[in-house]
Each structure stands twice: as C-alpha cells, then as structure tokens.
Amino acid sequence: MKYVRYIAAESLRMYPEPPLLIRRALESDELPPGSGGPDGVRPKITRGVDLFLAIYNLHRSKDFWENPDTFDPDRFDRPFENKGVQDWAGFRPELLEGQMYPNEVASDFAYLPFGGGQRKCVGDQFALMESVVTLSMLIRRFDFELTVKPEEVGFYTGATIHTRNGLPMRVKKRVFPGKSETEGGEASKSEPVKAAGSAVAA
C-alpha cells in the first residue's frame, strides 16, 4: 500500500487541489532571505495584504523538485537538496518515519497540497486515506483504459483543477478464476463492464 499512497501523493504534487492558496498578513513583515529578486532585496509585506501562494508552480519548480514534470512516486523515498535556495532544508525522507504520507515538514514547505502549519486542512489525512482505499479497491476489481490521448484531456483551473472535457475511459471488470464476481482470487482476464466505452468524468 505504500506505493499506492505515494501515487496519491505524487498526483497531488503534480495537480494540487487547490492550485492556489490565499493568506492575509495579520501584521506587517518581510519575506525571508532568498525570496527577493536578483538584487537580494527582501519584499516587504503590509498588514492586511492578501498573499496568493501558487502551489502548482511551487510543486513544479526545479528549485525544489528533481525532474518536476515527471510523474515519479518513488521520489518521496529519495532525499533532494538545492544549495542554491537560501535556507531551504531540502526534502528529507527520514522525517517521514511514522507518517503515512509526505508532508510540509519533510519538504520544508515545498509540498503543500493541503497547505501547512496551523492553517493546514484538518481533513488531509482522512482525505488521503479515503482516496488510497478507494483507488486500491477500484484497481483490484477493474481495468481502466484511457480512450483519448493524454494530451487531449486538457485542464483548467478555478478553485480546483478540472479536466476540460472529462476523463473518457473504457472500464472492464476483472474476472477471477474459479470465483464469483463478488469473491476474491487472482485476476486472470478482463471482461467489459456493461457500460464499457462510456465516458467517466473525473
């Protein structure tokens, strides 16, 4: 199940929900070292200003991720550091000991699909566990085949990321030898579900 958990985590890295977070400064402050432009000036934040945090861009940044546009669930088992980013501690898998999923602590706030700190989503662990259990049950019982080219799916963003035209798939029920459809066993072949070929929107 560890690999399935990492698949869910990597999916949220590449397509975070939401792709943008908004925070309001309670007090005037300035951003930490390394956050300024080429001149090194640290931007000042005025009390009451709304800050838009581009999580999608953060998760796709080469500063914080190795090959960021590649789907690679195993990346969460590998340390990654970038001395060019001032005061960033890097991604440290050892900090995930006892944790089921990657988090902002192990990534020093480079991984924020649910936010981080005191304002982090309180349901993050439940949401991840629910998605992993659901995914595991589905892929055990069905085979899924995308009926369009991946580049044809398309995305658009609002409060969350959506597929532009749904996610058309051909779904086939997996058949287990010597077992009824409701019993377990090892899969031997696939048979089309009655609704095979219909579009399944994600």
Kindly give the residue locations of the regions a language model identified.
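Hydrophobic, well-ordered secondary-structure elements that form the walls
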Residues: 11, 48, 71, 117, ...
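Conserved cytochrome P450 K-helix/beta-meander segment immediately N-terminal to the heme-binding cysteine loop
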Residues: 15, 53-101
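C-terminal helix/juxtamembrane-tail motif
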Residues: 162-202
